[in-house]
A protein has these predicted regions:
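Intrinsically disordered, low-complexity regulatory regions of eukaryotic regulatory proteins
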Residues: 4-5, 66
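Short terminal hydrophobic/aromatic SLiMs and anchors at protein ends
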Residues: 2, 9-11
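Conserved alpha/beta cores of soluble small-molecule-handling proteins
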Residues: 22-181
């Protein structure tokens, strides 16, 4: 079912793209590994190019990581507290004890958009287990937290915001929350 859903999702994206609803300027950006600026990394602001993790980190190999995706509008993170609560809830479900408080993560998120001078953009907090050991659980691995932010305008062509956009709703039902841990 998931494969079919993904296939349908991409067909819809292709349909929208073929109708030129998307703003293609988003696709013409600097690769993320070539950008400049700062990233909040384990409590410090580091140069974008120095925010690196080891190839053998547990988060990469065993998916022991969680993240959020947050939009910035007019210099403010949309529903920041709700996103942060969900990040902490996801971490708890993964058995990850957060090394920072919700207040510290909110403060760091606001700090990074201020330092990056972002008016409209995107914030990506990520939490993962480090590379101290490779095992199924690796509960003793250090927990790392990074928060990146970058400019990211609207998904849609600006003139379509004025003209309006036709949307479709799917007959597919979302899986219930208790279907996945």
């Amino acid at each position: 079912i998931l494969v079919r859903y993904v296939d349908i999702f991409y067909q819809q994206i292709y349909f929208f793209v073929s109708k030129k609803l998307f703003n293609f300027n988003l696709m013409e950006t600097i690769p993320y590994d070539k950008r400049s600026g700062k990233i909040w990394f384990n409590g410090e602001l580091v140069d974008w190019s120095n925010a690196k993790v080891h190839l053998l980190n547990h988060g990469l190999h065993y998916a022991s990581c969680v993240f959020e995706g947050e939009r910035i509008y007019d210099g403010e993170i949309f529903k920041l507290q709700e996103h942060t609560q969900r990040l902490f809830h996801s971490a708890k479900r993964m058995g990850i004890k957060m090394p920072y408080s919700e207040k510290e993560i909110n403060s760091a998120s606001n700090e990074i958009i201020r330092v990056q001078k972002i008016k409209d953009g995107y914030v990506r907090p990520v939490v993962w287990r480090g590379s101290e050991m490779m095992a199924i659980s690796a509960q003793k691995n250090k927990i790392h937290v990074g928060i990146a932010a970058w400019e990211w305008g609207s998904y849609f062509d600006p003139k379509l915001k004025l003209e309006g956009i036709k949307l479709q709703t799917s007959s597919w039902r979302r899986p219930p929350p208790n279907s996945v841990p």
